[in-house]
């Protein structure tokens, strides 16, 4: 739960669906949408405000979620057309997920409003009604509008409704409007729209072909000896260790690591296996486990171990034998000068 300035709201945490999240991420990347992936990222009112009104949440939530955050305030931002295409790609991702799940796509963001400058307080209920009608019946027309046109009709912050096109892109051309409401209490138009798909299930070979498409870029890499692509699955497994080692950039953290490592392992919630890999300085084992090299070299800098020594250990060679394979006999690390 994000603290947005006045302490977090009194709501329970919500669980995610990690496997579906990874599948969606990999599918969107395969469809050429450049995604960033997060752990430990608090959610704000964009999720909790609408969902706490829709679902019971006294002690827990009855759903698992996959948050998809799209920046629409700091320019440059995606176009309306790009958002719609993202929705279409999201549909392919969900339909190709091998497990049979019920999935609802929730779009958030206020309709007409502006909350900055001399134009703050601007609303346009007529545009809001037109937008909702177009979203249901002719979403392609909405993809032709520029950000300036959205801002003119609905306020600068009201342009965030382009994210609703992501939701609409996941649905079939024809949808059933189950519910619609509109409310303008103060600064922001609040609309609720419930749509139901009218599509048919795809033949199984279509979804299988998409899953193969998702694997295309790495096809064959599994045959490379001693090579471990840093996939989302490996990242998830090694997350605690990678987070622990990344904190070596903090002077106090690395000092505590050198003086009281066991206490630090416990504080970070490392498993016994993870702690033992660090105790033994098992460079190869750390890579096998799911640690990315670029935090291993931070550990090496703290311990006074060069990158070349780590490379040699990963290859199972002495540093002398490894150096014979290099053009220059030089050792280096990411360590800087110690402060005076």
Curated annotation (Swiss-Prot):
InterPro entries assigned to the protein according to its UniProt record, in alphabetical order: Gallate_dioxygenase_C, LigA_sf, Xdiol_dOase_LigA, Xdiol_dOase_suB
EC number(s) from the headed UniProt entry: 1.13.11.57
Cofactor annotation: Fe(2+)
Any one Gene Ontology BP term: gallate catabolic process
Active site residues according to the UniProt entry: 45 (proton donor), 113 (proton acceptor)
EC class: oxidoreductase
Domain of life (superkingdom): Bacteria
pH-dependent activity: Optimum pH is 7.0.
Keywords: Aromatic hydrocarbons catabolism, Dioxygenase, Oxidoreductase
Keyword Oxidoreductase found: yes
Catalyzed reactions per annotation: 3,4,5-trihydroxybenzoate + O2 = (1E)-4-oxobut-1-ene-1,2,4-tricarboxylate + 2 H(+)
Sequence similarity: Belongs to the LigB/MhpB extradiol dioxygenase family.
Protein name: Gallate dioxygenase
